[in-house]
Curated annotation (Swiss-Prot):
Active site: 10 (nucleophile)
The species this protein was found in: Xanthomonas campestris pv. campestris (strain ATCC 33913 / DSM 3586 / NCPPB 528 / LMG 568 / P 25)
Similarity comment: Belongs to the HAD-like hydrolase superfamily. CbbY/CbbZ/Gph/YieH family.
Pfam families named in the record: HAD_2 (PF13419)
Record field: catalytic activity: 2-phosphoglycolate + H2O = glycolate + phosphate
Binding site for Mg(2+): 10, 12, 168
Domain of life of the source: Bacteria
Record's protein name: Phosphoglycolate phosphatase
Metal-binding keyword on record: yes
Length: 221
């Protein structure tokens, strides 16, 4: 058993628990409008779905067009709060260190706007460690389209079949399958109550990051 040659990760809900930053963002918007704040339990399941899904929870009384108009404000406020409360999930740093010690190259493919993801790397000390970063607006397509994963693999010089993609959302697994890339479903991430990770057909389902400290837990080529 050995670690993969390369691993690509989703960011929010996979490496980083960014839900507290997101909650602070939407609650600041609500408070400014004299509206009641929401709880982390209300927001957490949709964090991986993006800003529009979070605004749909926080501003459920508004129609889709009115919520769409709030997206720029959300992104601006989130940028100001970025990293103030977010933390790595337990076991992620050790997992990355063990991959690096084994000679594995790793990178990030996220649907978060690239400029926001780039701001996070220095906060985590990952500027030199993360071999590639593809955001949701880096290319013409985003997950679940396979293009971001294929481009990331190409940039690190590893065939897609020799990479593993780790993500906490069904679209992550769909993108990996379409790219011909083995996949790991990160069950510690953000999911809706009716999500069924078994139906995603990931190669491996993992409950917590420490399980990925050992090579045997990873999909083997």
């Amino acid at each position: 058993m050995r670690f993969p040659r390369a691993v690509l990760f989703d960011l929010d809900g996979t490496l980083l628990d960014s839900a507290p930053d997101m909650l602070a963002t939407v609650n600041a918007m609500l408070s400014e409008r004299g509206l009641p704040c929401i709880t982390l339990a209300q927001l957490r399941p949709v964090v991986s779905k993006g800003s529009r899904a979070m605004l749909a929870v926080a501003f459920a009384h508004l129609d889709a067009a009115a919520r769409e108009a709030l997206v720029p404000e959300f992104l601006k406020r989130y940028e100001a709060l970025l990293g103030t409360q977010a933390q790595l999930f337990d076991g992620v740093e050790v997992m990355l260190q063990r991959l690096e010690q084994a000679g594995c190259v790793w990178g990030i493919v996220t649907n978060k706007p690239e400029y926001l993801a780039q701001l996070i790397l220095p906060q985590l000390g990952w500027q030199q460690r993360c071999a590639v970063l593809i955001g949701g607006d880096t290319l013409a397509e985003r997950k679940p389209h396979p293009l971001p994963l294929l481009v990331a693999a190409d940039r690190i010089g590893v065939a897609a079949t020799q990479c593993v993609y780790v993500g906490d959302d069904e679209r992550d697994i769909l993108a990996a399958r379409a790219a011909g890339m083995p996949s790991v479903a990160a069950l510690w991430g953000y999911r809706l109550g009716d999500d069924d990770p078994l139906s995603w057909q990931a190669d491996v389902l993992v409950e917590q990051p420490p399980q990925l400290w050992e090579p045997a837990a990873w999909p083997q080529p």
